[in-house]
């Protein structure tokens, strides 16, 4: 009877070890490198730089304070087949909520008139149309640090402030721009 008990314990331990070893902690469709997009504020305007061109964009979404009661979003859309996007003025820090992009992307869902995005903790950004990844950035850091960096440098989330040569050198090595295919 003791031998049967030991055999059961050994089988359970072996099964537990196999199940634990088989667990993958990464999301099934997560890219092999962290994705990022660049943001900065110049002359009171929140600016986007995707780092590389995103072709065929049919929509852009900014979500402030995602997952909280204060969560709110602004959405831009463009007709199919979409438009190329690399740099874009997104929002003003004061005054009317959105500058006129003058392009094919038009505000479909504006932020509420009384919403002050500069008080948000985070900004989540996503692109519709091409295969793309989302990006997240700290709003206070953008506002606080933009003036300290040259106008060609943008905050790429956890990657920090990067200019064109930094993005070209590091894209597909230490991070992915949001529209860069995963190299793996």
What are these regions (language model features)?
Residues 19-22:
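C-terminal motif of bacterial Sec signal peptides marking the signal peptidase cleavage site
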Residues 24-27:
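Bacterial signal peptide processing site
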Residues 31-33, 40, 170-184:
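Post-signal peptide N-terminal regions of Sec-secreted extracellular proteins
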Residues 34-88:
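Short, surface-exposed binding/anchoring microloops in extracellular/periplasmic proteins
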Residues 69-115:
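Extended, solvent-exposed segments with strong compositional bias
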Residues 99-178:
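Extracytosolic low-complexity repeat regions of secreted or lipid-anchored proteins
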């Amino acid at each position: 009877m003791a031998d049967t008990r030991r055999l059961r314990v050994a089988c359970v331990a072996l099964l537990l070890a196999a199940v634990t070893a088989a667990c993958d902690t990464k999301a099934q469709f997560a890219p092999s490198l962290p994705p990022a997009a660049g943001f900065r504020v110049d002359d009171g305007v929140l600016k986007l730089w995707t780092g590389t061109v995103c072709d065929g964009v049919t929509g852009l979404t900014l979500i402030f304070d995602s997952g909280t009661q204060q969560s709110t979003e602004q959405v831009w859309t463009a007709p199919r087949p979409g438009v190329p996007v690399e740099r874009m003025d997104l929002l003003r820090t004061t005054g009317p909520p959105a500058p006129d992009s003058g392009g094919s992307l038009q505000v479909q869902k504006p932020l509420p008139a009384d919403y002050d995005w500069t008080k948000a903790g985070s900004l989540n950004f996503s692109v519709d149309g091409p295969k793309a990844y989302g990006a997240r950035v700290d709003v206070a850091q953008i506002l606080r640090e933009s003036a300290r960096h040259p106008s060609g440098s943008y905050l790429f989330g956890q990657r920090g402030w990067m200019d064109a040569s930094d993005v070209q050198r590091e894209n597909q090595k230490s991070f992915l721009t949001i529209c860069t295919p995963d190299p793996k």
